[in-house]
């Protein structure tokens, strides 16, 4: 199915609800998303995000998902920073996209590169994919991401390295997670996600409120040398 995330039936109830409640719009949204994904350089990142946010808003409304945003005013005025959210589920990136007006790209593990729907979303936001079993390739991606930040764009990286299977509990951060920020000498923005595991990673269609908290940024001067 075009909304199959490879996680079994537990994801499908809410996804089907999102589709059914937007049945008339789904063909148009899917074609639009695929066209943007196939022509990533034809549109600006802002245009990609405008399209993506429309889809996310419609999906949220149809799927009983409310996204509450806190602290968006804490984001640095100038682009060129790295956001470090906790990693709860497949919905994380969509929640952040819906919670703030800024554009960003994502550093993700290569295992999610070809998941339908997410594949198209990742193409639109110019995501970078890391092979965690290949140190040389991983360092290359880190350098590429740092260059993206130096160009004045924003990057998301999940420092836990994988999704927590324990709800809102944090996992230990991976060593090397902050190399992108160190190389780019840019502000770090901690992002706290709450209940992001519920929409796509739990077997329920009950209304859920997802929280995205943008915490105070940490300037390079405060973490250099750590």
Predicted regions and their residues:
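Aromatic (phenylalanine/tyrosine) cluster motif
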Residues: 2-5
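A transmembrane-helix-recognition feature enriched in membrane-embedded lipid enzymes
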Residues: 8-68, 120-121
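Catalytic core of membrane glycerolipid acyltransferases/transacylases, capturing the structured
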Residues: 33-37, 47-49, 62-63, 77-135
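Short gly/ser/thr-rich secondary-structure transition/capping motifs
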Residues: 61-70, 138-139, 194-196
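Residue-level preference for the first positions of well-ordered beta-strands
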Residues: 80-82, 154-158
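Short glycine-rich anion-binding loops that position phosphate/pyrophosphate groups of nucleotides
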Residues: 87-89, 160-164
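A cross-family acyltransferase "interaction/gating" segment
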Residues: 117-120, 153-156, 165-226
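Anionic-ligand binding region
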Residues: 137-146
């Amino acid at each position: 199915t075009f909304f199959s995330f490879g996680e079994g039936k537990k994801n499908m109830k809410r996804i089907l609800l999102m589709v059914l409640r937007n049945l008339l719009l789904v063909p148009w949204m899917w074609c639009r998303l695929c066209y943007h994904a196939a022509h990533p350089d034809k549109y600006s990142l802002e245009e990609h995000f405008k399209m993506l946010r429309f889809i996310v808003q419609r999906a949220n409304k149809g799927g009983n998902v409310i996204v509450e945003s806190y602290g968006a005013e804490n984001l640095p005025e100038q682009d060129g920073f790295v956001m470090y959210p906790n990693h709860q589920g497949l919905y994380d990136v969509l929640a952040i996209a819906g919670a703030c007006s800024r554009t960003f790209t994502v550093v993700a593990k290569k295992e999610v590169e070809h998941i339908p729907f997410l594949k198209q979303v990742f193409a639109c936001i110019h995501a970078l994919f890391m092979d965690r079993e290949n140190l040389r390739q991983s360092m290359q991606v880190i350098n590429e991401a740092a260059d993206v930040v130096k160009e004045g764009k924003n990057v998301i990286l999940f420092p836990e390295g994988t999704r927590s299977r324990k709800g809102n509990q944090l996992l230990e951060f991976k060593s090397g997670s902050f190399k992108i920020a160190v190389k780019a000498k840019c502000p770090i923005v901690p992002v706290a996600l709450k209940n992001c595991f519920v929409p796509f990673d739990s077997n329920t269609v009950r209304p859920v409120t997802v929280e995205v908290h943008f915490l105070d940024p940490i300037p390079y001067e405060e973490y250099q040398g750590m």
